[in-house]
Swiss-Prot record:
It is an enzyme of class 2 (transferase). It comes from Staphylococcus epidermidis (strain ATCC 12228 / FDA PCI 1200). Keywords: Cell cycle, Cell division, Cell shape, Cell wall biogenesis/degradation, Cytoplasm, Peptidoglycan synthesis, Pyruvate, Transferase. This is UDP-N-acetylglucosamine 1-carboxyvinyltransferase 2. UDP-N-acetyl-alpha-D-glucosamine binds at residues 94, 123-127, 307, 329.
Length: 419
């Protein structure tokens, strides 16, 4: 069966400007959250990625009028109907689990297929389930393919998350906005995307305090009205381009960026020796090799993002000594290691840590096992001698808007082919 691949002839310097898209991890929660509104919602600054299109079509399955036009989405929930969503759309996208919290909040009932997304090892939704049960939902998990959630009424509760989880924090917020009384989420995730979703819900009339801290309080309200809302810039897309620019950038200017959101990466790149200029809403990066070796450990926000662990790895082949990368969030997130070895990289991983030594990369045929592994392989392809062919590019398109066109505009020798 024919499939699209991305090809890169490495060694070309990057120069120019890139506009960073809206945050994927905000958009995939805010789009389901629109179904909580009574009336019309307008979202601006959406990333133009396949995950957004999938979620919009899930809204349409609930008889919601949804018009997606580039970065803008208009939603009208006037004719909304509760319908089961156990279908292949849900399986293709992990963030479809936000439909659970939103539908539970709106209808007190939902039937939904089990979510999919990137295969990153264990990513259970047990904390989501724990939160829904605390709010009064009964959950039927007897089916292998779908889950049924029903609540006679939703009541505020004190919920302590056993592990910090962005998904669970947001999903419980969605379910709790209409619950009677006050809900408290302790050990809540502090990520900018959590704050963004809370700000969106508040723009519709929700009563939420403490988003961005470890304790979030939600006082249930009867009704949420429509609103207009602009999504924050994508810190992971920004970080991925920062890594590509540090690898091959003569001078790359990134616009629509919140420097505070990428602080952990910026500090690590400066440790490496990258030349970085930071302004209000833009960052300028110039390559400055050879780089110093560094150690990286992923942590929850504001620590180093697990989503940037893979994109930064190719830079560590350009250093003077060995570097160590440890992923404490998803210890199984090292499927890119084998692909980099195919390119001649001196890299090994074991039990959540990769050891990376200076290496010369050569073009090869490689497979993107997940979204951020795809960004890693693109960066590796930009550095490598010869042509790199990346298969399984659907993962890359799930999270990066027009990445091939952006890199081409910066001067990369990159193109797509059908094979």
């Amino acid at each position: 069966m024919a499939q699209e691949v991305i090809k890169i002839r490495g060694g070309q310097a990057l120069k120019g400007e890139v506009e960073i898209s809206g945050a994927k991890n905000s958009a995939v929660a805010i789009i389901p959250a629109t179904l909580l509104a009574q009336g019309q919602v307008k979202l601006e600054g959406l990333p133009q990625i396949s995950d957004v299109e999938t979620l919009v079509s899930l809204l349409e399955d609930l008889n919601i009028e949804a018009r997606l036009n580039g970065k803008q989405l208009e939603v009208d929930t006037t004719q909304i109907e509760n319908a089961p969503l156990p279908n292949n759309k849900v399986e293709s996208l992990r963030a479809s689990y936000y439909m659970m919290g939103a539908m539970l909040g709106r209808f007190k009932k939902c039937v939904i297929g089990l979510p999919g997304g990137c295969p990153l090892g264990p990513r259970p939704i047990d904390q989501h389930i724990k939160g829904f049960k605390a709010l009064g939902a009964e959950i039927d998990e007897s089916s292998n393919t779908s889950m049924k959630l029903v609540a006679k009424e939703l009541r505020g509760a004190h919920i302590f998350l056993d592990m910090v989880s962005v998904g669970a924090t947001i999903n419980i917020m969605l379910a709790a906005v209409h619950a009677k009384g006050q809900t408290v989420i302790d050990n809540a995730a502090k990520e900018p995307e959590v704050v963004d979703v809370a700000n969106f819900l508040m723009s519709m009339g929700a009563d939420i305090r403490g988003a961005g801290t470890t304790s979030i309080k939600i006082n249930g309200v009867e009704e949420l009205k429509g609103s207009e809302y602009q999504i924050i810039p994508d810190r992971i897309e920004a970080g991925s381009y920062m890594c590509m620019a540090a690898a091959m950038g003569e001078e790359v200017i990134l616009h629509n960026i919140v420097p505070k959101h990428v602080e952990a990466l910026t500090v690590k790149l400066q440790e490496l020796g990258v030349d970085i200029e930071i302004e209000d809403e833009k960052i300028i990066i110039r390559k400055q090799t050879p780089y110093k070796n560094v150690d990286i450990k992923t942590l929850v926000y504001p620590g180093f993002a697990t989503d940037l662990q893979q994109p930064i790895t190719p830079l560590l082949f350009m250093t003077e000594g060995p570097s160590f990368v440890t992923d404490t969030i998803y210890p199984a997130r090292f499927k890119h290691v084998e692909e980099l070895q195919c390119m001649g990289a001196n890299i090994k991983s074991d039990e959540g840590t990769a050891v990376i030594k200076p290496s010369t990369l050569n073009g090869a045929e490689v497979y993107a096992s997940d979204l951020r592994a795809g960004a890693c392989l693109i960066t590796a392809g930009l550095i490598a001698e010869g042509v790199t062919t990346i298969f399984n590019v659907k993962h890359i398109y799930r999270g990066y808007t027009n990445i091939v066109e952006h890199l081409k505009a910066l001067g990369a020798d990159i193109w797509t082919e059908t094979v």
